[in-house]
């Protein structure tokens, strides 16, 4: 009986060892593939600093560079669904974590999918719109504090990405079949016959209020699915970054 138990234990150990070995081989193979497939990226990439909060349940979604003081802002959400923080990394490496209160005083617990800034305000994506936060409040917030959003601006979808580029506010939605659907009128067939299932709005600056934007878009761009970022190059070309999973 003891011999049978010993044999069963030995077989189990061998099976577990084989499974672990296969898993390790798969991880190594994946790392090698990633290094080879994305070699041009890794050749040029730098690692200036670690993403703050990454090991505390914080799931980062966006970042923005504040030129005024050379700091970085990180938005995202918490895996445990607690209020969503914003991390600020100062030029000297000091990390500050603070929170955002909605205009009604309730805590912001949104996805934090996008944050972008100009000299006067920070704009933080929320459900069906974005929040407006005075930059002075944000830049001087103490660790653990809460900054007050002065307004929520409504949009007819929840922005998945948002960026201030060349004086205009760009924001768009994210499409992935079944999981992240978009309104039917956002689905447009392009001249080559493919379908773009999402849109990006471009809001012009508000001439009556420095740092703010008009609430009716100047332009609406038809874009592919799975877009999570955008910028405009110096020669006026629009760049879209795509990712999922």
Regions found by a protein language model. Name each.
Residues 49-84:
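Beta-strand-rich domains and repeat architectures in extracellular enzymes and scaffolds
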Residues 57-64, 107-114, 154-164, 224-229:
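Repeated scaffold domains used in trafficking and secretory/extracellular systems
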Residues 74-80, 172-195, 243-245:
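Short, conserved, GDST-rich strand-edge loop motifs in beta-rich repeat architectures
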Residues 84-92, 185-207:
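Beta-propeller blade signature
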Residues 85, 93-120:
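Blade-loop segments of beta-propeller domains
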Residues 220-245:
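Loop/turn-rich, solvent-exposed surfaces of beta-rich toroidal or solenoidal domains
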């Amino acid at each position: 009986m003891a011999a049978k138990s010993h044999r069963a234990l030995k077989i189990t150990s061998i099976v577990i060892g084989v499974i672990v070995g296969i898993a390790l081989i798969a991880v190594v193979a994946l790392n090698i593939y990633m290094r080879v497939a994305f070699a041009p990226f890794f050749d040029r990439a730098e690692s200036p600093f670690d993403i703050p909060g990454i090991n505390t349940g914080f799931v980062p979604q966006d970042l923005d560079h504040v030129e005024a003081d050379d700091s970085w802002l990180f938005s995202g959400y918490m895996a445990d669904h607690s209020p969503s923080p914003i991390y600020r990394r100062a030029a000297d490496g000091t990390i500050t974590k603070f929170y955002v209160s909605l205009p009604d005083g309730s805590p912001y617990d949104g996805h934090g999918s996008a944050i972008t800034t100009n000299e006067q305000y920070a704009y933080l994506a929320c459900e069906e719109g974005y929040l407006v936060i005075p930059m002075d409040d944000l830049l001087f917030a103490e660790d653990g504090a809460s900054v007050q959003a002065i307004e929520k601006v409504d949009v007819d979808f929840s922005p998945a990405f948002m960026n201030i580029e060349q004086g205009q506010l760009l924001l768009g939605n994210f499409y992935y079949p079944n999981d992240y659907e978009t309104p039917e009128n956002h689905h447009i067939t392009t001249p080559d016959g493919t379908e773009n299932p999402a849109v990006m709005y471009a809001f012009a600056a508000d001439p009556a209020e420095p740092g703010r934007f008009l609430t009716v878009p100047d332009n609406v761009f038809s874009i592919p699915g799975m877009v999570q970022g955008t910028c405009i190059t110096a020669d006026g070309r629009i760049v879209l970054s795509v990712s999922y999973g």
